[in-house]
Amino acid sequence: MTRYKAIISYDGSGFYGYQIQPNARTVQAEIEKALKKMHKGKNVRITASGRTDTGVHAKGQVIHFDSDLDITADKFQKALQVMTPFDISFLTVDEAPADFHARFGTVGKEYRYIVKRTKIFDPFSRNFALHYPYELDIAKMKLASECLIGEHDFTSFCSARTERDSKVRTLYSIDFYEEDEETLVIAFQGNGFLYNMVRILTGTLLDAGQGRISSEDITEALLARDRQKLISKTAPPQGLYLWRVDYE
């Protein structure tokens, strides 16, 4: 039995998230369906670095699975590329150590959120970015982001449905890239992220850019450890991308 590590990308628009759900199209279900065909009806379970929600995309999701097929990793990659749907891509497949674990072995992740600042709505980007036709002060957004960097209890910045006992996470950086006059990319790097955390942080920073909230408001929300203390809305899923997963 050989363990394989794969880096995959997917367009989340047509999926009800990553994780298998009854009577729903998911990324995990489509990949396991392909692996089952390759293994002549035998179920092969895959494990990912983490789940993504409905409509959320991935540029560098990492999964692992075990197989007893006598084929090379390169052939695995080519076969899975053909056998999975057009909205999933296998970027790499490599043999991995037997103790490699896509979820528990992570030391950091990067998420990016894409904001389109066009005055007129672009229907061709509706599934891949947030349309935000309002003025933004990027300097205020950067200032607001500074109080979020470091180790904090992010209870105020995650969904009440978060299942984790500890809400303490470390944000290494929040960077802002203006790719052009119309496109703003917000990149979040940290040791881990809670349910809806990046989308709530994005909504908060957009409010800061509009002057609706200040750095002091964000600091107070952090200390309150109560989602109800934060007035910012959760940014919609279509602008969010799991960009990269890091391992030791």
Swiss-Prot record:
Enzyme class: isomerase
Catalytic residues in the record: D53 (nucleophile)
Catalytic reaction list: uridine(38/39/40) in tRNA = pseudouridine(38/39/40) in tRNA
InterPro entries given in the database record: PsdUridine_synth_cat_dom_sf (IPR020103), PsdUridine_synth_TruA (IPR001406), PsdUridine_synth_TruA_a/b_dom (IPR020097), PsdUridine_synth_TruA_C (IPR020095), TruA/RsuA/RluB/E/F_N (IPR020094)
Enzyme Commission identifier(s): 5.4.99.12
Gene Ontology biological-process entries: tRNA pseudouridine synthesis
GO terms for MF: RNA binding; tRNA pseudouridine(38-40) synthase activity
Cited SUPFAM superfamilies: Pseudouridine synthase (SSF55120)
Keyword annotations of the record: Isomerase, tRNA processing
Binding site for substrate: Y111
Record's subunit section: Homodimer.
Assigned protein family: Belongs to the tRNA pseudouridine synthase TruA family.
Function: Formation of pseudouridine at positions 38, 39 and 40 in the anticodon stem and loop of transfer RNAs.
Full protein name: tRNA pseudouridine synthase A
Organism for this UniProt entry: Listeria welshimeri serovar 6b (strain ATCC 35897 / DSM 20650 / CCUG 15529 / CIP 8149 / NCTC 11857 / SLCC 5334 / V8)
